Structure formats: C-alpha cells, structure tokens
Amino acid sequence: MPAVVTDQFRILNASNFVDTVTGIGGTDPSNSFYVTLGLPNPTIVGFGRTSTWNTSTPNPVDNINNNNNIGDTTLFGKRVTGKNVRRLIRKVDWTQGTRYEMYRHDYSIDSPSPVTQSARLYDSRYYVINENFNVYICIDNGSSGINTTGNASQDQPTFTDLEPSRAGESGDGYIWKFLYTVSPSDIIKFDSTEFIAVPNDWTTTNDATIQAVRENGDSDLNNNQIKKVYIDNQGNGYSGGVGQEFNILGDGTGGKVVVDVVGGKITNAVISAGGKGYTYGIVDLGTINANASIKAKLIPIIPPSKGHGFNVYEELGTDRVLCYARFGGDNKDFPFDTKFAQVELVKNPTSVGTTSIYFSDSYSSLNSIKFPSTTTSVPTIGEKISQSVTGGTAVGYVASFDKETKVLKYFQDRSLYFGNGEDQTDYVGISTLGQKFAFQSTANPITAPSGFSGSVETTFSSGITTVGTKNVGLGVTFTNGLAEPEINKGSGDIIYIDNR
C-alpha cells in the first residue's frame, strides 16, 4: 500500500526536538544535550579509523558497536541550551533579476512549482531573506495562466509593515509579506550560506514584533485569511466590467474578491476581504458567466493554518534544527592542542559513578594524569602511551598535553587491545595484551614512542595547580595525580554523528 512520511511529520519532529532541548514552554528541561568532539587520531590503524580519513572521509556507521566506541574516543562536550538551538529553513537570498515563486498550497508531483519544478512547497523558491536579514514570503510574482513562471524580481523588499505590499515602483508584479527579522544574536550563532534561523516560541512569544505578525495572520481575529486569487484561466465571454466584487465560496466564510472583466476576459482579481476558515475556495462568478464560451478558472490560494504569519513553522517548512556550541575560553575541559574527526550530539549522559543525568555546562570525557612541573618531554597527540602496572601494561592514546600545567589527557578504546587494531582476530599474547588496565599512581614511568617519559605526580590531589605565580584551574579534580572523566564513558544516547 502506498504511504508517505508527510512534511508536517518532519516539521513536528523538529519542533519536538527543540521542545525537548528547551523544555516545554522554555523552562525546566528534564533532558540534557551536549555537542561532543572526539577521535583525535582517525588515520592510525584502529577500529573505526582509516588511513584515508582526511582525503576520503567515511560515512558514519550507525550501530551499537560503533556507538560504544564513540563513547570511548570522545574528548569533551558542551551543553546545548534553548538559547543555542533553532529551527532552520533553506537560505534563499533576494537577488535582483531572479525569478521567485509565489506561495501556493497545491504544489505536487502532478502540479510542480513553475520555476524550480518542485513537487513540494518547501523545496520551491517562495520566500527570501534580504540584506537586512528580513524574511518575506512571496504572495504574488506576477504569474498567471498566460505567464506561469511570473516575472523577475526587480525591487528588494525592505518594509516591515504587516500587510502584503509591493517593494518598489518597477512594476515587477511582486507582492511580499513580511514575516520576521533574524535577530543579531541568531545571526552570530546560526547564520550560514545554506540556512536561515527561525525564532523559537513563535506561537507563544510575547515579543512585540512577532506577536504583531502572528496576530495579523490570525483570521479568527481579523477575517484576513486569503491574500491571493490566482487567475489560471481568464475565460471568455464574461459580462460586466472592472471592479465587480464576488464571494469566495468553500468551507470558510467572508472571503470576497474584486474582479476586472475586459473584453469578456477576467484580467485582474484582487482580494477585498480575506475571510476565515477556508481549506478550499471557489469564486462565485454565477452572475456574469451566463454567456461565457470559455470557463474561467480562479484559484483562491489558501494560506497555512489561519493565515500568513500565524505559524511560520508550517508556513516555511522548518524541518531542520541547528545546535550551536562554542568551544573556547579558559575552560580546561576543552584542550586546544588536540584534534578531532567526529562531532556528535549526545542526550542525557550521566555523571561519573552515578546514574544521574549530567547537567553542567561542559564536561571532559577523558582520563587525566598530572606530571611534575619538572617534566620536560612532550608527547605527540594521538600516539600511544604505556605504563607497567600490576598484572600487565596500561596503554592509552594521547588526546592532549598541557605544557604549562603538565596535565596529559588520554583515552582507551578497543583498538589498543585488538591484535590487528581493527577486529577480534586472535593473536599471540592476547591473554595479557588483550586485557584493559588502568594507569596507576606509582613511580613507574609512562612512556611513548616519540621519546616522552614521565612519572605520575603521586602527591598531587587537587583541581588547581600553580604555574609561575598563577593558580590555574584544571577542570577536573585529581587524586594522587590521576583524574577520572566527569561522565560515565559511553553514557547517553548518540542521536547525531558527523565525520569530519
């Protein structure tokens, strides 16, 4: 049986995700989301890696096995809050001389948009963003049954009036409807060459500008639903002249259109009353069609929801979401000397040693080792370190080394214990080399192939160290020179993976 996942389902999914991040109504979220960075050594021989990563980046693998490994190779995370998540739409810049498409409720495979041949409204070019970051929807582009693609736009819309209007005096036939202005903070966080940010909480916000647009689009308040009647066929043999007003029939009420008849043909149709409650409409030309030899076809264009501007998520098709995270500042959770090849979005990681959801602004998911200030050698990011410990040898990959604080951060993933680095193929020595050992707070040196060598500062138990005359916070608390991650390794649900 034929079936389809609808556009409205996609829009709903995006809205549900935003609500999950921000909390319903924007308060007291019960979930915690983090953008994480990981995999600093993607080109070595190892599980989930490839020597050609930097030139031919592989597609992410979505299964439990790979997700578990991502948990082991993650470096750190930054929390995403309601201020840092937005719905998105495709960016369509206004450019003089470009032919845009008008909003229509009936684009389909059988009746695609005339310029881009899009079967979906949301794939067509029916809205623009101008140089001032104002977003407008195209109510009319001068198109009709005898000019199906409309005209090239000559006048950039810049007005912020509530009612649809032409943008200038060129006569290009365009009528634009102002929707909103992208805020300066959203420009800084979310602007890109591909997408436009859409404000959160459109349907409930008390922001004066948005509220005015929303209420102007509420036909229950102002009987202002329909803005355009499209002349698909002018017909012939119609009586009367210019300025004749007719009712718009259908399942709504109050809609009226003023029609001009010239030479028996309908040459113009302008809404005089938008009405309310329409999901379809038909113009009642019964008083002038008695002698019509060719029947006219006038199509009332039905806005989404209650009217243009009432619900921009439905109007613009906000089926994408962007999360913004800024890694920087003095936060020691984010080492600046590392690399990363994967970006993830993780939901509800748990605090180390507990089952409680982690809610702090950021976290380190790496183990840390504090070396004495006299340590002079420096390891290479991504290389293997090792230490002789009780029962065997502890091994790990270097994620970061702070030359000032002498803190080394490392991770341990399955590649260290697979004989070939990649899978479970048996090998000689597996009984000892296949076991995972933790680094220990002993005098036994930690070494690396680059020549790095140093011993744990076993007397260091603090989250602050002294560098010269400064006290420097380390982001984690050490006990006898060792520190655990701030979250349980691999905890939380990975809902997005991006290989870089």
Predicted feature locations:
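Conserved, function-critical positions that sit in or immediately flank catalytic
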Residues: 169-500
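Tryptophan-rich substrate-binding surfaces of secreted polymer-degrading and adhesive proteins
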Residues: 1-221, 293-297, 387, 392-396, ...
